Amino acid sequence: MGLFDRIKRVVSSNLNDLVNKAEDPEKMLEQAILEMQEDLVQLRQGVAQAIAAQKRSEKQYNDAQNEINKWQRNAQLALQKGDENLARQALERKKTYTDTSAALKASLDTQSTQVETLKRNLIQLESKISEAKTKKEMLKARITTAKAQEQLQGMVRGMNTSSAMSAFERMEEKVLMQESRAQALGELAGADLETQFAQLEGGSDVDDELAALKAQMLPPATPVTQAQLPPQQETTPAKSNEVVDAELDSLRKQLDQL
């Protein structure tokens, strides 16, 4: 396939169709870009050569026009001098350059059309290369994203979500148990302290009640006269002491039973 046929094929191609049909779109685009860049180099060389040929044809055409004008003037000059034969030769030379000029003009028109076509193809090829590079970068980004999503989905599928949730629930249950245990220990510590103070208060009440009971059991005090005082040698009757001791023993037994 010639250069111009390849360029025509590339310029008229649809990159989206090429990508969709390719087994490896990224590799296909990379190869297409390389081929288009090679074609671009050749096309630029071809455009440069065509422009150079066009310039040569333009110069030859202009030179032929100058010769036509020159021999036209020479023919007129010969006629003015009365030399008709010389004028005829000048006109024959003019005709030769006129034929050459016509051929050069036709060739120049064809070259101009070809150069314009090559320039358009060059612009389109550069645009295709830019489009291919952009699609390549977009495709690479999509491939990277797709691979990341696939990897993430694989990780999610590999995870046992129910087992993980059960583990979290067990951890939460342990934390709640520890919190409840700490709260219960705090309440017990407070209860023990209150019990100790209650025992202290209760002990004080018992002591007070015992003292009051003793005071009630003592005989009331009566005025003592000198006549009523027993002799110094006498002591308190033993019977009164026995009664008090018996009552105290009874009281102790009652307290022990509490």
UniProtKB/Swiss-Prot annotation:
Subcellular location: Cell inner membrane
Chief location bin: membrane
Keywords from the named record: Cell inner membrane, Cell membrane, Lipid-binding, Membrane
Membrane topology note: Peripheral membrane protein
Presence of the UniProt keyword Cytoplasm in the record: no
Positions of the UniProt region annotated as Disordered: 217-258
GO CC terms: plasma membrane
Ranges that cross the membrane: none
GO MF, any single term: lipid binding
Biased composition, class Polar residues, residue ranges: 223-239
UniProt xrefs under Pfam families: PspA_IM30
InterPro entries documented for this protein: PspA_VIPP1
Comp. bias intervals (Basic and acidic residues): 249-258
Top-level taxon in the UniProt lineage: Bacteria
Function recorded in the entry: A membrane remodeling protein capable of forming rings and/or filaments on membranes, which then curve and tubulate the bilayer. Rings will form on liposomes, altering their positive curvature so the lipid bilayer is remodeled into a negative curve as the membrane enters the ring. Ring stacks of varying lengths can be seen joining isolated liposomes. A lipid monolayer can be drawn into the center of the rings. Required for thylakoid formation.
Domain notes: A helical hairpin is formed by residues 25-137 which is conserved in all known ESCRT-III proteins. Helix 5N-5C (residues 193-217) contacts the helical hairpin 3 subunits away and is essential for oligomerization. The C-terminal flexible linker and alpha-helix 6 (residues 220-256) are not required for oligomerization and do not resolve in electron microscopy.
Subunit structure: Polymerizes to form rings, filaments and ribbons. Rings are formed by stacked rungs that tilt to give a dome-shaped curvature. Rings form with symmetries ranging from C11 (55 subunits) to C17 (119 subunits).
Family: Belongs to the PspA/Vipp/IM30 family.
Entry protein name: Membrane-associated protein Vipp1
Organism: Nostoc punctiforme (strain ATCC 29133 / PCC 73102)
The organism's taxonomic lineage, starting at the top: Bacteria, Bacillati, Cyanobacteriota, Cyanophyceae, Nostocales
Gene name of the record: vipp1
